Amino acid sequence: MRKLFLVFLIALGFCVHSAIAFGATAAPDVATEAAEAWLALADKGDAQATWHQAAGAFKTGVEQKDWEKTLPKARQPLGEVISRKLQSSETTTTLPGVADGEYVIFRFQTSFTNKKSASEALLMQKEADGVWRTVGYFIQ
């Protein structure tokens, strides 16, 4: 399961790059608000809440108990968030390897206490109930 999710994340990284390269349109405000709310939970270290607020595809790709170990391992060494600036937001309806739908790819430039310059990418999906939820989260 972990290998499958890792392959999904790598493929998604290529998708994010491709979608941005082809100049998709800007994100709706409600998607931006959902992304910022999800990141605020991650900033507090609330892995359980981030998993519950994630999209079904995310939950299918990673079990809650695994996510509750993975997020702290990725975020704690970075320290607290000092600043975060939205670099870009792009909408798309197609991404390789995932079902067609409404997606927004957010890229943030983030400064942490232990890493002054990091790039965060957050992929949001508008689910059938009309709510924007996180499908993927990446830190470089």
Regions found by a protein language model. Name each.
Residues 22-25, 36-39, 54-59, 109-111:
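Second-shell loop/turn segments in exported
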Residues 4, 18-46:
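Short, low-complexity N-terminal intrinsically disordered segments enriched in polar/charged residues
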Residues 7-17:
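Bacterial N-terminal signal peptides
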